[in-house]
Amino acid sequence: GHSGDDINKGRGNAIKILNRFLWDLNERYGLLVASLEGGNLRNAIAREANAVIVFDEVLKENIRVDFNMYAAEMEEVWKITEPGLQLELESVDLPGEVLTQEFTNKLLNALYACPHGVFAMSYRMPGMVETSTNLAAVKFIENDTILITTSQRSDVDSEKMNIAHMVAAVFRLIGAEVEHG
């Protein structure tokens, strides 16, 4: 959905839903991310996301069981606002390149910590969102670059800057370059 129109409807963000699972797997077993992509428009809530991960072969069945449990949990969590939620797990060929363990940890932690959704409701207009932030897209692009796009909205300029700075701080903690546009 459009981040300005739908941010207050409790819609799921595919990047956040996927990253939550990957973060948990990484905490329990350790994994390496080869790719993680989702979303495509700055002003839209991410509807799709996918990742390729690498882990020890002996963990394959554990991860499959964990995935099935997570998928069932997410279907329950999102059954009202995302009744068509689909989560899929499949085996793929071993990728040629993966992120280091250190950078996998940083990326998954930053995406987990990145705020998304309604930050504040308006006191002047009850029922209206005052300030929100959207984790819009994650793209692995050339030259070992990961582009993470977010957007912030507010009817109070200082609050828009506040939430934009909060998002920037999350990514600066992992050494990312941050640009405001």
What are these regions (language model features)?
Residues 1-153:
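Midchain, well-structured core segments that form catalytic/ion-binding scaffolds
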Residues 158-177:
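Redox- and metal-dependent alpha/beta enzyme cores, enriched for Fe-S-associated oxidoreductases
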Residues 179-181:
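Short acidic alpha-helical/loop segments enriched in Asp/Glu that coordinate divalent cations
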